[in-house]
């Protein structure tokens, strides 16, 4: 078997994707399919941590205009990410893939607190580590969390799973003439204003020289394909 392209990665999943075709909530068949993809990718030999959003359950930004303060709303959203991590952890364990959820918040009855040492330990043991609670601070997205955690644990890349197969010059769903980039620098991604990740995430990735691979999660097996170097996507790297 060929060596995977990366020894350790952070996979960033959107919470909305876990809802499947539903407007909100957790769609179990979708969670099970993603768990299968993650387990298959782990079998290639790459150590995998996962940061998942919480938008399928709660979005703090949306309630800030309805009387809930932004910090409170963001905290509620970060707690939603822990729920998604627990759902993925259970789905992975059912498949026989050992997993461990870690949270940025202290909640010992629910899951262990994130520390770099704990993440290193579980990753080296072959577990898939699920990172919930965002950064633990309001105003930071889970995209930024993914880059931050990747830098902290020494990951070699962030795999940003989306519903399109890379970064395009414009929205390919609205503009049939949109072209896909094979490669961009972090600075080009920032200056171009591409909406695939927020500016803070791109800036932190640039500062830490961390590659981001943007790809579509819709195709089963796409995570493994990226790790093997055969997947379709856009590499954002300096």
Curated annotation (Swiss-Prot):
Chief location: cytoplasm
Single GO term (MF): ATP binding
EC number(s) on file: 2.7.4.22
Keyword ATP-binding: yes
Gene Ontology cellular-component terms listed: cytosol
Protein location: Cytoplasm
Pathway this chain belongs to: Pyrimidine metabolism; CTP biosynthesis via de novo pathway; UDP from UMP (UMPK route): step 1/1
InterPro entries in the cross-refs: AceGlu_kinase-like_sf (IPR036393), Asp/Glu/Uridylate_kinase (IPR001048), Uridylate_kinase (IPR011817), Uridylate_kinase_bac (IPR015963)
Positions annotated to bind UMP: 54, 74, 135-142
Summary of activators and inhibitors of this protein: Inhibited by UTP.
EC top class named in words: transferase
Assigned keywords, A-Z: ATP-binding, Cytoplasm, Kinase, Nucleotide-binding, Pyrimidine biosynthesis, Transferase
Residues that bind ATP: 12-15, 55, 59, 162-163, 168, 171
GO biological process, one term: 'de novo' CTP biosynthetic process
Reactions listed under catalytic activity: UMP + ATP = UDP + ADP
UniProt entry tagged with the keyword Ribonucleoprotein: no
Annotated function: Catalyzes the reversible phosphorylation of UMP to UDP.
Quaternary structure (record): Homohexamer.
Family membership: Belongs to the UMP kinase family.
HAMAP family associated with the record: PyrH_B (MF_01220_B)
Protein name: Uridylate kinase
Organism: Nitrobacter hamburgensis (strain DSM 10229 / NCIMB 13809 / X14)
Lineage, top ranks: Bacteria, Pseudomonadati, Pseudomonadota, Alphaproteobacteria, Hyphomicrobiales
């Amino acid at each position: 078997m060929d060596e995977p392209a990366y020894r350790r990665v952070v996979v960033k999943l959107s919470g909305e994707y876990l809802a499947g075709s539903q407007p909100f909530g957790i769609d179990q068949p979708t969670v099970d399919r993603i768990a299968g993809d993650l387990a298959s990718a782990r079998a290639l030999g790459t150590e995998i941590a996962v940061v998942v959003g919480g938008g399928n359950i709660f979005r703090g930004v949306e309630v800030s205009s309805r009387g809930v303060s932004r910090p409170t709303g963001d905290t509620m959203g970060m707690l939603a990410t822990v729920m998604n991590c627990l759902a993925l952890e259970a789905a992975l364990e059912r498949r026989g893939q050992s997993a461990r959820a870690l949270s940025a918040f202290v909640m010992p009855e629910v899951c262990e607190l994130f520390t770099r040492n704990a993440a290193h330990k579980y990753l080296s043991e072959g577990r898939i580590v699920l990172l919930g609670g965002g950064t633990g601070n309001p105003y930071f997205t889970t995209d930024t969390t993914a880059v931050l955690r990747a830098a902290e644990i020494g990951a070699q890349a962030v795999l940003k799973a989306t519903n399109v197969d890379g970064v395009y010059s414009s929205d390919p769903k609205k503009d049939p003439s949109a072209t896909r980039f094979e490669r961009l620098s972090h600075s080009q991604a920032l200056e171009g204003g591409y909406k695939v990740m927020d500016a803070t995430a791109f800036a932190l990735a640039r500062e830490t020289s961390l590659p981001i691979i943007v790809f579509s999660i819709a195709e089963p097996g796409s995570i493994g394909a990226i790790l093997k170097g055969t997947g379709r996507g856009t590499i954002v790297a300096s």
